[in-house]
Amino acid sequence: MKGATGVLESWSLGVTVSSHCLDHSGLYSGTIDERMNDFRHALYDPAVKAVLCSRGGYGAVHLLDGLTDDIARNPKWIIGFSDISALHALCVSRGVMSLHAPMCKHLTTEPAVNRCTQYLRQILFGEFHEVKELP
């Protein structure tokens, strides 16, 4: 998380790391209730503009039923891919935009000049205005 936090802060973004992000509960960063509470806290915090997932994983599906109403009431960009696509589908079903984009894990394992990382930055800052097929 330190590497990803550093990248985001270098973009002049404020970063809040959820309470249980670095915890361990089996294969997950916390129990279902802990992860649900972290996610809800981010959704209801007016200072939080987007939720950038740290990594994908099957644990995302555990949150779907509990977040259905929260996502609709407090729309924010949910950013990630892989198993995070389950959260994207929930967002779309509630009319909320989300971003299929790099997660924290990839901000640190990919070079800062990675095209997807740069597109994410441009989208977050409203600078990305073109969608086209890549060569």
Model feature map: region roles:
Residues 52-61, 81:
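N-terminal glycine-rich "phosphate-gripper" loop used for MgATP/nucleotide binding
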Residues 1-47:
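ATP/NTP phosphate-donor binding region
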